[in-house]
Amino acid sequence: MADLYEWGGRNADGVWEFDKKRPDWDLPIHQLMAKYGVSIFFQGHDHIFVRQEKDGVVYQETPNPANPFYGETTDRFRSAYKSGDYRPPSGHLRVTVGPSITKVDYIRSWMPKDETPEHQQGEVAFSYTVKPGK
């Protein structure tokens, strides 16, 4: 997690190449975020819910509210995430920012035909808080 290329400086074999590949950069992106106290980073490429943490930085993959596949078995990106909190796709994030704490809620999306007593549109499937960085 956050170890490769401009994010962490290593190539796919784990060899440090940052200085060769990014000669004008002082530090990889992850090291910059850790150094300057970034507490959370939101990323939205894979369209699933995964929360990971490294060196005090929370990496939050953002879900897709229109994903019609609710179960883990249909999620083709699951194997790319070796650690962290994973939840099945289809939902959105509600982020509440305050002066001393930020709360992130994962709100599930369900088509009306797929709702059950256990799974309702708008249910909070996962929550966590993050304190401000330094």
Predicted segment positions?
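Long, structured stretches of catalytic cores involved in phosphate-ester chemistry, encompassing
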Residues: M1-D114
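C-terminal/domain-terminus segments
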Residues: I107-G133
